[in-house]
């Protein structure tokens, strides 16, 4: 018989297995921070948009990090923080050191007499400026920092694309002017060629080597060429973005099917031509997107009046011609705009370029940011203050300060149909105080659906009656809204809500959003308007597909997962049962053995005493 102790142990084991299974269903990550929810929802809505149309805020590491903190390993902590808070584009100056014939991050060459302690920062004077540089800060160390971030976010919930923009520059050999001999030039060059073995082992001699540590997560020109030649792109969901030969994989293919995370692009090449300059190798062309490698990056400058005026014209475009938006979506790729100390972004210009489909790159040392405590705007050079100011403005989708509890968007329903019968009748209460109380009571459960207003997406009461944004199939920049048809969100997805060939839709990119807002302005339609998005099933998990769409991140236990959960515990249980069985078979109990010998002896004595032969008479 199995002892009570063993039964108890097995019971606890079974309960633990069941507890693990149940916990896996309910324990999905708590993604309550506003920015994280906005980042994930915008990414999910745009996952079938080609990667060249994905936009996001960027930062110049040289201007805002290294020039202020020094070119040291400690500065990489800021890089990690930038990635963590949602900055997905990093602009970096790569310097070709003509003295050492290697790429480095420090803008100045290290002297030949540098100490063997490569982790000590040095004050280096070069080209009229003094830099604080640490030899151990290499491109490899930067890549390792980014790889750490990639590993930490390698889940379906957090995965995203990181774009590195390289500006190539030269640390040129410029010997003293005048009549100098070749030996004097050689001596001059040697003064900036450290011979210490620790230093010589640092940095890389080719662009390919600088990015090779990304491994298979790097999306390369070779990958793009293979994608365009294969039939793979035919399987991408949004055919509109695959109409040209210069098509790119969509974000879903990039991240979740091909498992790519990083793309490196040279956006400017200021290498000085000389006998010591860098020559691009065939390996470079296969790993880094250079000019002519199939990516025509659009780089605009904020100081360029034409770029500003073109963006303003696009925002206020009121002509019935969707080709303007289609041409941008199909013919312009990776659109970025960079500012400088002469013309830095304001909140308005930053937001405008985001709306125009650009990725704004912060490249100025100081910005006019809003101080919440003082309630005023002030010039600030703090990286954290600058990023905190611009991150909420970096979404082409969500309006600023959305997703903040408890209000969750519009405070008062725009509907006057208070009895929710989809008709305006005598049963509806026009008293604003009564309506306010009714809206307040339902706000905690009904504010789960998304509308579009003049500032972007906002969470609203699902029972409010609004016009419906209808998007044409196969033509995502073509919209239709019938102002006479106002419905609750729960009925907006029905077939009769939109004309033939149109469906209840949502903008999946900044240009689609701009096309919709242009249509609304042109048709003089009042905001807000329903778009197909809600978090009804799981809080903070915004999905498209109507009110019954399920959250893709809600944990479920399939048979395979359940088998995986139970298998380890089942093996342990089998081992325990085997041990119990072995104990029953092979273990000898002294008390039980003595008892058997006693009775056997007594029986033998009885038999000897009363032993009979034959049948007693």
UniProtKB/Swiss-Prot annotation:
InterPro entries in the cross-refs: Telomere_Capping_Maintenance
Segments in the Extracellular topological domain: 23-561
Positions annotated as glycosylated: 113, 179, 204, 208, 242, 279, 327, 341, 347, 363, 411, 524
Stretches with biased composition (Acidic residues): 416-431
Coiled coil segments of this chain: none
Stretches for region Disordered: 409-435
Transmembrane segments: 562-582
Record's signal peptide: 1-22
Membrane topology, from the record: Single-pass type I membrane protein
Cytoplasmic side: 583-617
Localization terms from the record: Membrane
GO cellular component, one term: membrane
Keywords of this entry: Glycoprotein, Membrane, Signal, Transmembrane, Transmembrane helix
Family to which this protein belongs: Belongs to the MTC6 family.
Described purpose of this protein according to its UniProt entry: May be involved in telomere capping.
Alphabetized PANTHER family for the sequence: MAINTENANCE OF TELOMERE CAPPING PROTEIN 6, MAINTENANCE OF TELOMOERE CAPPING
Annotated protein name in UniProt: Maintenance of telomere capping protein 6
Species lineage: Eukaryota, Fungi, Dikarya, Ascomycota, Saccharomycotina
């Amino acid at each position: 018989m199995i002892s009570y102790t063993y039964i108890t142990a097995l019971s606890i084991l079974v309960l633990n297995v069941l507890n693990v299974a149940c916990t896996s269903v309910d324990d999905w990550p708590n993604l309550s921070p506003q920015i994280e929810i906005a980042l994930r929802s915008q990414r999910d809505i745009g996952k079938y948009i080609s990667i060249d149309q994905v936009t996001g805020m960027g930062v110049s590491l040289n201007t805002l990090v290294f020039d202020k903190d020094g070119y040291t390993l400690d500065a990489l902590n800021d890089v990690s923080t930038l990635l963590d808070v949602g900055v997905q584009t990093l602009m970096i100056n790569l310097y070709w050191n003509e003295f050492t014939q290697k790429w480095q991050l420090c803008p100045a060459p290290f002297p030949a007499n540098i100490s063997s302690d490569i982790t000590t920062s040095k004050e280096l004077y070069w080209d009229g400026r003094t830099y604080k540089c640490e030899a151990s800060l290499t491109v490899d160390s930067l890549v390792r920092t980014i790889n750490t971030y990639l590993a930490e976010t390698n889940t379906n919930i957090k995965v995203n694309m990181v774009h590195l923009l390289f500006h190539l520059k030269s640390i040129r050999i410029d010997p003293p002017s005048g009549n100098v001999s070749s030996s004097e030039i050689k001596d001059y060059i040697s003064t900036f060629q450290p011979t210490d073995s620790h230093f010589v082992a640092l940095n890389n001699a080719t662009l390919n080597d600088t990015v090779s540590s990304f491994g298979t997560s790097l999306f390369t020109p070779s990958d793009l060429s293979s994608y365009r030649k294969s039939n793979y792109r035919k399987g991408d969901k949004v055919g509109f973005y695959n109409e040209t030969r210069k098509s790119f994989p969509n974000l879903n293919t990039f991240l979740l099917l091909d498992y790519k995370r990083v793309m490196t692009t040279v956006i400017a090449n200021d290498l000085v031509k000389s006998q010591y300059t860098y020559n691009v190798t065939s390996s470079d062309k296969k790993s880094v997107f250079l000019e002519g490698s199939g990516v025509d990056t659009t780089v605009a400058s904020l100081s360029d009046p034409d770029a500003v005026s073109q963006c303003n014209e696009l925002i206020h475009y009121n002509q019935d011609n969707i080709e303007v938006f289609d041409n941008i979506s199909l013919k312009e790729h990776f659109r970025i705009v960079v500012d400088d100390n002469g013309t830095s972004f304001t909140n308005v210009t930053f937001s405008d370029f985001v709306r125009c489909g650009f990725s704004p790159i912060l490249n100025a040392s100081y910005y006019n940011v809003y101080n919440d405590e003082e309630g005023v705007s002030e010039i600030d050079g703090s990286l954290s203050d600058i990023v905190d100011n611009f991150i909420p403005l970096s979404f082409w989708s969500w309006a600023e300060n959305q997703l903040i509890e408890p209000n969750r968007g519009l405070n008062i329903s725009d509907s006057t149909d208070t009895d929710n019968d989809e008709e305006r009748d005598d049963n509806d209460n026009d008293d604003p105080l009564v309506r306010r109380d009714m809206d307040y009571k339902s706000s905690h459960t009904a504010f789960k659906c998304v509308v579009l207003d003049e500032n972007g997406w906002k969470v609203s009461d699902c029972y409010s009656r609004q016009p419906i944004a209808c998007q044409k199939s196969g033509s995502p920049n073509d919209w239709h809204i019938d102002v006479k048809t106002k419905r609750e969100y729960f009925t907006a997805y029905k077939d009769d809500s939109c004309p033939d060939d149109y469906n209840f839709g949502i903008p999946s990119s900044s240009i689609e959003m701009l096309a919709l807002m242009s249509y609304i302005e042109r048709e003089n339609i009042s905001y807000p308007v329903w778009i197909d998005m809600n978090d009804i099933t799981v809080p903070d998990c915004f999905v498209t597909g109507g009110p019954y769409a399920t959250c893709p991140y809600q944990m479920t236990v399939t048979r395979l997962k359940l088998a995986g959960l139970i298998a380890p515990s089942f093996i342990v249980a089998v081992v325990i049962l085997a041990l119990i069985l072995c104990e029953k078979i092979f273990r000898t109990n002294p008390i039980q053995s003595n008892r058997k010998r006693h009775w056997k002896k007594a029986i033998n004595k009885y038999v000897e005493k009363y032993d009979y032969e034959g049948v007693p008479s």
